[in-house]
Amino acid sequence: MKHIKAIIQPDKLSAVRAGLANTDSYRGIIISDIMGQGTQKGIVQAWRGEKFQMDLIPKVMIDLIVKDEDVDKITKIIYDSSRSGEIGDGKIFIYHVENAIRIRTGESGNDALV
């Protein structure tokens, strides 16, 4: 099993979710609003004629746990749906998951994901 963590632009979330809706390769998703700074180093905004620097930029973090054989498919959907080619598009991280246990039934491993 793998943990896919994607950090994307907030305006790309609908496209990512629409892409993921067309697959049965995952059963659950966690979506979090976050703030972050990367290569972009913040943005300059104006309010009432005054300019100010925003060091932390709003992003969305998506977490999914998937079977090993579904990692490439899910990663491609997220990548294709969220890429604009501009700085600040985000990142996708993939981690190994030792085990998963469904609390309700006690099922573990891949059985806990379905």
Feature locations, PLM:
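Positively charged, small/polar-rich N-terminal and surface patches that mediate targeting and assembly
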Residues: 1-114
